[in-house]
Design a protein with these regions (language model features):
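Alpha-helical secondary-structure segments
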Residues: 26-30, 74-75, 103-105, 123, ...
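Ligand/substrate-recognition segments at binding pockets and active sites
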Residues: 83, 227-234, 240-312, 353, ...
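Alpha-to-beta junction loops
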Residues: 27-29, 117, 122-131, 275, ...
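Structural transition elements
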Residues: 195-243, 262-266
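Gly/Pro-rich hinge or "lid" segments in bacterial periplasmic/extracellular proteins
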Residues: 3-18, 27, 33-101, 105, ...
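Ligand-site clamp/hinge motif
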Residues: 93-138
Length: 409
Protein backbone atom coordinates (compact mmCIF):
# COMPACT_ATOMS: atom_id res chain seq x y z
CA UNK A 1 0.00 0.00 0.00
CA UNK A 2 1.21 3.50 -0.86
CA UNK A 3 -0.71 5.32 1.89
CA UNK A 4 0.13 4.25 5.43
CA UNK A 5 -2.48 1.90 6.83
CA UNK A 6 -4.51 1.59 3.61
CA UNK A 7 -4.43 -2.20 3.23
CA UNK A 8 -5.53 -2.80 6.82
CA UNK A 9 -8.34 -0.27 6.58
CA UNK A 10 -9.45 -1.61 3.20
CA UNK A 11 -9.74 -5.21 4.42
CA UNK A 12 -11.53 -4.13 7.59
CA UNK A 13 -8.85 -5.17 10.05
CA UNK A 14 -8.12 -1.59 11.16
CA UNK A 15 -10.24 1.43 12.00
CA UNK A 16 -10.39 4.17 9.32
CA UNK A 17 -9.00 6.61 11.87
CA UNK A 18 -5.63 4.85 11.53
CA UNK A 19 -5.35 5.73 7.84
CA UNK A 20 -2.40 8.00 7.10
CA UNK A 21 -4.52 10.89 5.83
CA UNK A 22 -5.16 13.95 7.98
CA UNK A 23 -6.98 17.25 7.42
CA UNK A 24 -4.47 19.58 9.09
CA UNK A 25 -6.74 22.57 8.56
CA UNK A 26 -9.40 23.78 6.12
CA UNK A 27 -6.80 24.28 3.39
CA UNK A 28 -4.29 21.49 4.05
CA UNK A 29 -4.46 17.74 3.52
CA UNK A 30 -1.57 15.65 4.83
CA UNK A 31 -0.95 12.20 3.33
CA UNK A 32 1.65 9.89 4.88
CA UNK A 33 3.22 7.45 2.43
CA UNK A 34 4.84 4.09 3.07
CA UNK A 35 7.60 4.80 0.55
CA UNK A 36 9.11 7.68 -1.38
CA UNK A 37 6.84 7.93 -4.45
CA UNK A 38 8.36 10.09 -7.23
CA UNK A 39 5.10 10.19 -9.19
CA UNK A 40 2.86 11.06 -6.24
CA UNK A 41 1.95 14.50 -7.58
CA UNK A 42 0.78 12.90 -10.83
CA UNK A 43 -1.43 10.54 -8.85
CA UNK A 44 -2.96 13.52 -7.05
CA UNK A 45 -3.84 14.94 -10.48
CA UNK A 46 -5.71 11.73 -11.36
CA UNK A 47 -9.51 12.23 -11.35
CA UNK A 48 -10.09 9.57 -8.69
CA UNK A 49 -8.28 11.78 -6.15
CA UNK A 50 -10.22 14.99 -6.86
CA UNK A 51 -12.04 16.45 -3.83
CA UNK A 52 -15.83 16.29 -3.66
CA UNK A 53 -18.44 17.77 -1.32
CA UNK A 54 -19.14 15.27 1.46
CA UNK A 55 -22.66 16.56 2.06
CA UNK A 56 -23.53 16.15 -1.62
CA UNK A 57 -22.04 12.67 -1.88
CA UNK A 58 -23.99 11.54 1.16
CA UNK A 59 -27.22 13.21 0.06
CA UNK A 60 -28.13 10.63 -2.59
CA UNK A 61 -26.76 7.64 -4.48
CA UNK A 62 -27.60 9.58 -7.65
CA UNK A 63 -25.80 12.81 -6.71
CA UNK A 64 -23.66 12.68 -9.88
CA UNK A 65 -26.74 12.77 -12.12
CA UNK A 66 -28.06 16.12 -10.94
CA UNK A 67 -26.30 19.42 -11.80
CA UNK A 68 -27.40 20.89 -8.46
CA UNK A 69 -25.48 18.24 -6.49
CA UNK A 70 -22.72 17.36 -8.95
CA UNK A 71 -20.29 19.89 -7.52
CA UNK A 72 -16.57 19.99 -8.26
CA UNK A 73 -13.74 22.48 -8.12
CA UNK A 74 -12.83 22.71 -11.81
CA UNK A 75 -12.97 25.67 -14.18
CA UNK A 76 -16.48 24.80 -15.43
CA UNK A 77 -19.62 23.63 -13.66
CA UNK A 78 -22.49 21.56 -15.00
CA UNK A 79 -25.72 23.50 -15.56
CA UNK A 80 -27.80 20.96 -17.47
CA UNK A 81 -27.68 17.26 -18.23
CA UNK A 82 -30.17 15.88 -20.71
CA UNK A 83 -29.36 12.21 -20.36
CA UNK A 84 -28.22 10.49 -23.56
CA UNK A 85 -28.41 13.86 -25.33
CA UNK A 86 -26.04 16.56 -24.00
CA UNK A 87 -24.29 18.15 -21.02
CA UNK A 88 -24.07 21.93 -20.73
CA UNK A 89 -21.42 23.66 -18.63
CA UNK A 90 -20.59 27.26 -17.77
CA UNK A 91 -17.63 29.02 -16.21
CA UNK A 92 -17.22 28.44 -12.50
CA UNK A 93 -17.18 31.85 -10.79
CA UNK A 94 -15.31 30.31 -7.85
CA UNK A 95 -12.42 29.06 -9.98
CA UNK A 96 -9.10 30.66 -9.05
CA UNK A 97 -8.31 31.62 -12.68
CA UNK A 98 -11.84 32.61 -13.65
CA UNK A 99 -10.80 35.84 -15.39
CA UNK A 100 -8.64 33.98 -17.90
CA UNK A 101 -11.08 31.24 -18.85
CA UNK A 102 -12.30 30.97 -22.41
CA UNK A 103 -15.88 30.37 -23.56
CA UNK A 104 -18.75 31.28 -21.24
CA UNK A 105 -20.42 27.95 -21.96
CA UNK A 106 -19.40 24.58 -23.36
CA UNK A 107 -21.87 21.99 -24.63
CA UNK A 108 -20.92 18.31 -24.87
CA UNK A 109 -23.19 16.34 -27.19
CA UNK A 110 -23.55 12.68 -26.16
CA UNK A 111 -23.38 10.30 -29.12
CA UNK A 112 -22.44 6.65 -29.49
CA UNK A 113 -22.85 6.56 -33.27
CA UNK A 114 -19.56 7.33 -35.01
CA UNK A 115 -21.29 8.11 -38.29
CA UNK A 116 -23.49 10.67 -36.53
CA UNK A 117 -20.40 12.23 -34.93
CA UNK A 118 -18.67 12.65 -38.27
CA UNK A 119 -21.83 14.04 -39.88
CA UNK A 120 -22.23 16.54 -37.04
CA UNK A 121 -18.63 17.66 -37.40
CA UNK A 122 -18.82 18.04 -41.17
CA UNK A 123 -22.03 20.09 -41.07
CA UNK A 124 -20.69 22.40 -38.36
CA UNK A 125 -22.88 21.24 -35.48
CA UNK A 126 -19.85 19.89 -33.60
CA UNK A 127 -16.45 21.56 -33.19
CA UNK A 128 -14.69 18.47 -31.88
CA UNK A 129 -15.02 14.69 -32.15
CA UNK A 130 -12.75 11.89 -30.96
CA UNK A 131 -14.40 8.98 -32.77
CA UNK A 132 -15.26 8.41 -36.40
CA UNK A 133 -16.01 5.32 -38.51
CA UNK A 134 -12.92 3.13 -38.90
CA UNK A 135 -13.24 2.97 -42.68
CA UNK A 136 -13.18 6.78 -42.84
CA UNK A 137 -9.94 7.14 -40.87
CA UNK A 138 -7.50 6.70 -43.81
CA UNK A 139 -9.32 9.39 -45.82
CA UNK A 140 -9.24 11.98 -43.04
CA UNK A 141 -5.66 11.11 -42.13
CA UNK A 142 -4.62 11.72 -45.72
CA UNK A 143 -6.45 15.06 -45.82
CA UNK A 144 -4.78 16.23 -42.62
CA UNK A 145 -8.12 16.84 -40.89
CA UNK A 146 -7.65 13.96 -38.46
CA UNK A 147 -5.09 14.53 -35.71
CA UNK A 148 -3.32 11.62 -34.02
CA UNK A 149 -2.29 12.31 -30.43
CA UNK A 150 0.10 10.23 -28.36
CA UNK A 151 -1.60 8.02 -25.80
CA UNK A 152 0.18 6.19 -22.99
CA UNK A 153 -1.42 2.80 -23.46
CA UNK A 154 -0.85 -0.69 -24.87
CA UNK A 155 -3.24 -3.16 -26.48
CA UNK A 156 -2.06 -6.71 -25.87
CA UNK A 157 -2.87 -10.39 -25.62
CA UNK A 158 -2.91 -11.82 -22.12
CA UNK A 159 -2.07 -15.49 -21.55
CA UNK A 160 -3.44 -17.40 -18.57
CA UNK A 161 -0.18 -18.68 -17.11
CA UNK A 162 -2.05 -21.21 -14.96
CA UNK A 163 -3.68 -22.81 -18.00
CA UNK A 164 -2.24 -26.25 -18.79
CA UNK A 165 -1.34 -25.24 -22.34
CA UNK A 166 -0.04 -21.73 -21.71
CA UNK A 167 1.93 -22.47 -18.56
CA UNK A 168 4.92 -22.96 -20.92
CA UNK A 169 6.61 -19.60 -21.67
CA UNK A 170 7.98 -20.93 -24.97
CA UNK A 171 4.47 -21.66 -26.22
CA UNK A 172 3.43 -18.17 -25.15
CA UNK A 173 6.41 -16.75 -27.03
CA UNK A 174 5.51 -18.74 -30.15
CA UNK A 175 1.99 -17.32 -30.15
CA UNK A 176 3.40 -13.81 -29.72
CA UNK A 177 5.98 -14.08 -32.51
CA UNK A 178 3.46 -14.95 -35.25
CA UNK A 179 1.31 -11.89 -34.59
CA UNK A 180 1.65 -9.61 -37.61
CA UNK A 181 1.37 -6.33 -35.76
CA UNK A 182 1.79 -4.21 -38.88
CA UNK A 183 -1.12 -5.96 -40.57
CA UNK A 184 -3.38 -5.33 -37.59
CA UNK A 185 -2.68 -1.59 -37.33
CA UNK A 186 -2.75 -1.04 -41.10
CA UNK A 187 -5.75 -3.18 -42.02
CA UNK A 188 -7.85 -3.77 -38.90
CA UNK A 189 -7.61 -1.02 -36.28
CA UNK A 190 -6.54 1.71 -38.76
CA UNK A 191 -6.40 4.58 -36.25
CA UNK A 192 -2.73 5.43 -36.48
CA UNK A 193 -1.67 2.97 -33.77
CA UNK A 194 2.00 2.04 -33.47
CA UNK A 195 3.06 -1.64 -33.67
CA UNK A 196 4.32 -2.62 -30.21
CA UNK A 197 7.84 -4.01 -29.78
CA UNK A 198 7.55 -4.05 -25.98
CA UNK A 199 4.98 -3.64 -23.25
CA UNK A 200 5.62 -0.17 -21.76
CA UNK A 201 4.62 2.20 -24.57
CA UNK A 202 6.35 5.09 -26.25
CA UNK A 203 6.27 8.35 -24.30
CA UNK A 204 6.64 6.96 -20.78
CA UNK A 205 9.43 8.79 -18.97
CA UNK A 206 12.73 7.10 -18.16
CA UNK A 207 15.32 8.26 -15.61
CA UNK A 208 16.14 11.54 -17.36
CA UNK A 209 12.48 12.57 -17.54
CA UNK A 210 10.58 14.43 -20.24
CA UNK A 211 12.58 15.64 -23.22
CA UNK A 212 15.06 12.75 -23.09
CA UNK A 213 14.97 9.17 -24.34
CA UNK A 214 11.82 7.51 -23.05
CA UNK A 215 11.49 4.13 -21.34
CA UNK A 216 10.76 2.29 -24.58
CA UNK A 217 13.76 3.78 -26.38
CA UNK A 218 16.08 2.89 -23.51
CA UNK A 219 14.59 -0.59 -23.12
CA UNK A 220 14.70 -1.43 -26.82
CA UNK A 221 12.74 -4.08 -28.71
CA UNK A 222 11.88 -7.58 -27.53
CA UNK A 223 11.23 -8.80 -31.08
CA UNK A 224 11.37 -7.30 -34.54
CA UNK A 225 8.26 -5.60 -35.86
CA UNK A 226 9.78 -5.13 -39.31
CA UNK A 227 7.79 -6.60 -42.20
CA UNK A 228 11.05 -8.05 -43.52
CA UNK A 229 11.53 -10.08 -40.34
CA UNK A 230 8.02 -11.46 -40.00
CA UNK A 231 8.76 -14.78 -41.70
CA UNK A 232 11.86 -15.26 -39.54
CA UNK A 233 9.68 -14.62 -36.47
CA UNK A 234 7.26 -17.29 -37.70
CA UNK A 235 10.08 -19.78 -38.28
CA UNK A 236 11.33 -19.24 -34.73
CA UNK A 237 7.78 -19.67 -33.41
CA UNK A 238 7.28 -22.96 -35.27
CA UNK A 239 10.58 -24.24 -33.89
CA UNK A 240 9.52 -23.29 -30.35
CA UNK A 241 6.27 -25.19 -30.82
CA UNK A 242 8.14 -28.21 -32.22
CA UNK A 243 10.55 -28.14 -29.27
CA UNK A 244 7.52 -28.22 -26.98
CA UNK A 245 6.35 -31.42 -28.69
CA UNK A 246 4.01 -30.00 -31.34
CA UNK A 247 5.76 -30.06 -34.76
CA UNK A 248 3.63 -28.08 -37.24
CA UNK A 249 1.01 -27.86 -34.53
CA UNK A 250 0.38 -31.61 -34.51
CA UNK A 251 -1.30 -32.77 -31.32
CA UNK A 252 -1.77 -29.23 -30.02
CA UNK A 253 -5.12 -28.96 -28.24
CA UNK A 254 -7.86 -26.69 -29.55
CA UNK A 255 -7.67 -23.38 -27.72
CA UNK A 256 -10.01 -20.43 -27.20
CA UNK A 257 -9.37 -16.71 -27.57
CA UNK A 258 -11.73 -14.57 -25.51
CA UNK A 259 -12.70 -10.99 -26.26
CA UNK A 260 -15.62 -8.62 -25.89
CA UNK A 261 -17.91 -8.05 -28.83
CA UNK A 262 -17.61 -4.26 -29.21
CA UNK A 263 -15.61 -2.10 -31.61
CA UNK A 264 -12.64 -3.63 -33.38
CA UNK A 265 -11.98 -6.27 -30.73
CA UNK A 266 -13.84 -8.99 -32.62
CA UNK A 267 -12.05 -8.13 -35.88
CA UNK A 268 -8.67 -8.19 -34.15
CA UNK A 269 -9.59 -11.57 -32.66
CA UNK A 270 -10.41 -12.90 -36.12
CA UNK A 271 -7.06 -11.65 -37.44
CA UNK A 272 -5.20 -13.31 -34.56
CA UNK A 273 -7.14 -16.53 -35.08
CA UNK A 274 -6.08 -16.60 -38.73
CA UNK A 275 -2.41 -15.88 -37.93
CA UNK A 276 -2.18 -18.57 -35.25
CA UNK A 277 -3.95 -21.17 -37.36
CA UNK A 278 -2.03 -20.37 -40.55
CA UNK A 279 1.47 -20.01 -39.11
CA UNK A 280 1.37 -22.52 -36.24
CA UNK A 281 -1.06 -25.12 -37.55
CA UNK A 282 -3.23 -24.97 -34.43
CA UNK A 283 -7.00 -24.66 -34.06
CA UNK A 284 -8.32 -21.54 -32.35
CA UNK A 285 -11.93 -20.85 -31.38
CA UNK A 286 -13.21 -17.34 -30.72
CA UNK A 287 -15.37 -16.54 -27.71
CA UNK A 288 -16.97 -13.10 -28.11
CA UNK A 289 -18.63 -12.08 -24.86
CA UNK A 290 -20.70 -9.27 -23.42
CA UNK A 291 -18.39 -6.67 -21.83
CA UNK A 292 -19.34 -7.30 -18.20
CA UNK A 293 -19.22 -11.08 -18.62
CA UNK A 294 -15.86 -10.83 -20.37
CA UNK A 295 -14.36 -8.64 -17.64
CA UNK A 296 -15.44 -10.99 -14.88
CA UNK A 297 -14.21 -14.10 -16.68
CA UNK A 298 -10.85 -12.51 -17.37
CA UNK A 299 -10.47 -11.35 -13.78
CA UNK A 300 -11.43 -14.81 -12.48
CA UNK A 301 -8.95 -16.54 -14.80
CA UNK A 302 -11.69 -18.24 -16.83
CA UNK A 303 -9.85 -18.00 -20.15
CA UNK A 304 -6.84 -19.32 -22.07
CA UNK A 305 -5.93 -16.25 -24.12
CA UNK A 306 -7.77 -12.94 -23.80
CA UNK A 307 -7.55 -9.52 -25.28
CA UNK A 308 -6.40 -6.87 -22.85
CA UNK A 309 -5.22 -3.30 -22.73
CA UNK A 310 -3.92 -0.77 -20.26
CA UNK A 311 -3.91 3.03 -20.24
CA UNK A 312 -1.52 4.75 -17.83
CA UNK A 313 -2.95 6.54 -14.81
CA UNK A 314 0.29 8.54 -14.54
CA UNK A 315 3.49 8.92 -16.57
CA UNK A 316 5.73 6.32 -14.98
CA UNK A 317 6.54 2.70 -15.93
CA UNK A 318 5.19 1.64 -12.54
CA UNK A 319 1.69 2.27 -13.90
CA UNK A 320 2.22 -0.63 -16.33
CA UNK A 321 4.51 -2.94 -14.42
CA UNK A 322 3.40 -3.22 -10.80
CA UNK A 323 0.07 -4.73 -11.87
CA UNK A 324 1.78 -8.06 -12.64
CA UNK A 325 3.03 -8.48 -9.08
CA UNK A 326 1.95 -11.79 -7.52
CA UNK A 327 -1.74 -11.61 -6.55
CA UNK A 328 -2.04 -8.06 -7.91
CA UNK A 329 -5.60 -6.86 -8.36
CA UNK A 330 -5.18 -6.44 -12.13
CA UNK A 331 -2.98 -9.51 -12.63
CA UNK A 332 -5.38 -11.22 -15.04
CA UNK A 333 -2.59 -13.51 -16.29
CA UNK A 334 -2.47 -15.19 -12.84
CA UNK A 335 1.28 -14.61 -13.13
CA UNK A 336 3.75 -15.17 -10.31
CA UNK A 337 7.53 -14.97 -10.43
CA UNK A 338 9.61 -14.15 -7.32
CA UNK A 339 12.30 -12.52 -9.47
CA UNK A 340 9.72 -10.22 -11.02
CA UNK A 341 8.30 -9.31 -7.62
CA UNK A 342 11.82 -8.59 -6.36
CA UNK A 343 12.45 -6.21 -9.27
CA UNK A 344 9.24 -4.30 -8.54
CA UNK A 345 10.12 -4.19 -4.84
CA UNK A 346 13.56 -2.82 -5.71
CA UNK A 347 12.05 -0.10 -7.90
CA UNK A 348 9.72 0.99 -5.11
CA UNK A 349 12.45 0.90 -2.47
CA UNK A 350 14.49 3.73 -3.97
CA UNK A 351 13.88 7.29 -5.10
CA UNK A 352 17.06 7.37 -7.20
CA UNK A 353 15.89 7.75 -10.83
CA UNK A 354 18.63 5.59 -12.32
CA UNK A 355 18.13 2.77 -9.83
CA UNK A 356 14.34 2.88 -10.20
CA UNK A 357 14.48 2.61 -13.96
CA UNK A 358 17.13 -0.10 -13.87
CA UNK A 359 14.79 -2.19 -11.73
CA UNK A 360 11.78 -1.48 -13.94
CA UNK A 361 13.72 -2.47 -17.07
CA UNK A 362 14.71 -5.69 -15.32
CA UNK A 363 11.05 -6.31 -14.53
CA UNK A 364 9.99 -5.82 -18.15
CA UNK A 365 12.84 -8.07 -19.30
CA UNK A 366 11.44 -10.83 -17.09
CA UNK A 367 7.79 -10.21 -18.00
CA UNK A 368 8.22 -10.01 -21.78
CA UNK A 369 11.74 -11.11 -22.68
CA UNK A 370 11.92 -14.18 -20.45
CA UNK A 371 8.39 -15.25 -19.52
CA UNK A 372 6.33 -13.90 -22.47
CA UNK A 373 3.37 -13.36 -20.17
CA UNK A 374 1.86 -10.87 -22.60
CA UNK A 375 1.94 -10.40 -26.35
CA UNK A 376 1.88 -6.63 -26.95
CA UNK A 377 0.14 -5.77 -30.22
CA UNK A 378 0.11 -1.98 -30.54
CA UNK A 379 0.57 1.24 -28.64
CA UNK A 380 -2.62 3.27 -28.47
CA UNK A 381 -3.04 6.62 -30.12
CA UNK A 382 -5.85 9.16 -29.74
CA UNK A 383 -7.45 10.26 -33.02
CA UNK A 384 -9.55 13.42 -32.97
CA UNK A 385 -10.85 16.17 -35.22
CA UNK A 386 -10.95 19.80 -34.10
CA UNK A 387 -12.49 22.78 -35.86
CA UNK A 388 -9.47 24.73 -37.20
CA UNK A 389 -11.12 27.93 -35.93
CA UNK A 390 -10.67 26.70 -32.34
CA UNK A 391 -7.48 27.80 -30.56
CA UNK A 392 -6.17 26.82 -27.13
CA UNK A 393 -7.39 23.24 -26.82
CA UNK A 394 -4.89 21.19 -24.82
CA UNK A 395 -4.46 17.41 -24.97
CA UNK A 396 -2.32 15.24 -22.69
CA UNK A 397 -0.92 11.76 -23.52
CA UNK A 398 -2.95 10.43 -20.60
CA UNK A 399 -6.01 10.94 -22.81
CA UNK A 400 -7.50 14.16 -21.43
CA UNK A 401 -8.78 17.06 -23.52
CA UNK A 402 -8.97 20.53 -21.96
CA UNK A 403 -11.22 23.21 -23.43
CA UNK A 404 -11.23 25.77 -20.61
CA UNK A 405 -8.87 28.20 -22.33
CA UNK A 406 -10.10 27.85 -25.89
CA UNK A 407 -11.31 30.59 -28.18
CA UNK A 408 -13.09 30.55 -31.52
CA UNK A 409 -12.13 32.79 -34.42
Amino acid sequence: DMVKGYDAVADGSADPSTLGITAVDDQTLQIDLTYDCPYFEEIMAFPATFPVRQDMVESSDNWTFDPSTYIGNGPYKMTEWSHNAYISMEKNENYYDYENLGPDTIKFTLLDDNNAMLKGYNNGELDFIENLPVDEIPTYLASGELEIGDYLGTYYVCFNTEDEVFSDPNIRKAFSLVIDRNYIVENVSQAGEVPADGYVPNGVNDAAGAGSDDFRTVGGSYYSISDEDYEANCEEARQLLADAGYPNGEGFPTITYSTNDAGNHKKIGEALQNMWQTELGVTVNLNNQDWNVFLQNRKDGNFQIARNGWIADYNDPCSFLDMWYTDGGNNDAQYSNPDYDAAIDAAKATSDPEERMKAFHEAEDILIGQDSVLAPIYFYTQPYMLNPDIDGMYYTPLGYFFFGYTSKK
